[in-house]
Amino acid sequence: GADCSGFVMSVFANFGYELPRVAAAQYSASQKRDLSQMEVGDLVFYGSGISHVALYIGDGKVVHALNSNKGIVITDYNYDTPVGVGSYME
């Protein structure tokens, strides 16, 4: 199974986007957005050192590789406290 950043990277690769491999680098390279401006396709980042990333799918939900036991899951975006939102979409 993919880890969180690998999952996001492979989803974006399907649409021709090349993202960095790790969550912190994905955040650094993204266009920052305010949480209130979040749009479908944005990335939501978690953890003090940006240790986790999820893909926003609308209606307050994200899809992400939670951990090796749970695999790919859909949860509320605020299942944990988001520390940032980034976009790769034009």
Where are the regions that the model predicts?
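Aromatic- and glycine-rich peptidoglycan recognition patches
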Residues: Y17, A23-R33, S51, I57-E90
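Short loop/turn microsegments at loop-to-beta-strand junctions
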Residues: D3, S51-H52
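Catalytic cysteine-centered active-site loop
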Residues: G1-V40
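Hydrophobic beta-strand signal
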Residues: L43-F45
